[in-house]
Swiss-Prot record:
Function: Catalyzes the condensation of carbamoyl phosphate and aspartate to form carbamoyl aspartate and inorganic phosphate, the committed step in the de novo pyrimidine nucleotide biosynthesis pathway.
Pfam families cross-referenced by the UniProt entry: OTCace (PF00185), OTCace_N (PF02729)
GO process annotations (BP): 'de novo' pyrimidine nucleobase biosynthetic process; 'de novo' UMP biosynthetic process; amino acid metabolic process
PROSITE patterns, A to Z: CARBAMOYLTRANSFERASE
Substrates-to-products reaction catalysed: carbamoyl phosphate + L-aspartate = N-carbamoyl-L-aspartate + phosphate + H(+)
Organism per entry: Streptococcus equi subsp. equi (strain 4047)
Alphabetical UniProt keywords: Pyrimidine biosynthesis, Transferase
Pathway noted in the entry: Pyrimidine metabolism; UMP biosynthesis via de novo pathway; (S)-dihydroorotate from bicarbonate: step 2/3
One GO cellular component term noted in the UniProt record for this chain: cytosol
Record family assignment: Belongs to the aspartate/ornithine carbamoyltransferase superfamily. ATCase family.
Gene: pyrB
InterPro entries xrefs: Asp/Orn_carbamoyltranf_P-bd, Asp/Orn_carbamoylTrfase, Asp/Orn_carbamoylTrfase_sf, Asp_carbamoyltransf, Asp_carbamoyltransf_Asp/Orn-bd
Recorded GO MF terms: amino acid binding; aspartate carbamoyltransferase activity
Quaternary structure and interacting proteins, as annotated: Heterododecamer (2C3:3R2) of six catalytic PyrB chains organized as two trimers (C3), and six regulatory PyrI chains organized as three dimers (R2).
Protein name: Aspartate carbamoyltransferase catalytic subunit
Amino acid sequence: MSVVNNRVALKHLVSMEHLTNEEVLGLISRGSEYKAGKVAIKDNSRHFAANLFFENSTRTHKSFEVAENKLGLRVLDFNADTSAVNKGETLYDTVLTMSALGTEICVIRHPEDDYYQQLIDSPTITASIVNGGDGSGQHPSQCLLDLLTIYEEFGHFDGLKIAIAGDLTHSRVAKSNMQILKRLGAELYFYGPEQWYSSEFDSYGRYMAIDHIIDQLDVLMLLRVQHERHDGSQSFSKEDYHRQFGLTEERYRRLKDSAIIMHPAPVNRDVEIADHLVEAPKARIVAQMANGVFVRMAIIEAILNGRNDKV
């Protein structure tokens, strides 16, 4: 991996832990340049990408697809439900096949944590792997679009007070963001149901009730309650969760004028956030979605740079 004059070159992108601060800032800067229309698009029509999604997705899947098309790549159609996966084909063999066909970039979402390790360790698979989310592990492209959204607002990360709130244990978004935000100098707070908190967060910030900190926050990053990863013993009613942990109208009024609200979506309205606040003046949820395309363009460009440089 390398970066020279904001030109980032990556072999794979699977975890925020693998990126230097310089690479992170380079990708954010490049995403901003794409957003501003300052980048001349090269002829990438000889390059092939495949989006292999084994979990449901709207924003990540479609924004990668838009990004790939904006950059002029050829995007292979893949539907797990109609592929050989239904005949028992493993993830490894699916990616091995795509690689053998000449696919250079595989964007993958999979329910297994660290699914990518066997792929990037393979001496046979030559495709570059971009992690579109692994189980409860990492979500690097979401993290990078979150960083771009924050940077557009404040112009820096150092000293910002940021709360990450909600279903922490199951959130790959929380884990990716906490790692890099701490490295960039932000002051982190976590809150949500205690049974959805684990000691792995202790090294990155403080667990604190939202009502004790909300009026000091610069960024409130809400997380989706991942019902599909819970058993019944951990459940709350929608009303109880919203009252105890969600962004209510009363809590919204306590935020600083300069504070922003974020959410990776999909949003459970009137659970994590009151329905009418999703598009409120302080909300940047739609901006996050839009920024996803430009950051993912920067990621794909960095992968193509890395393949050209053979990093």
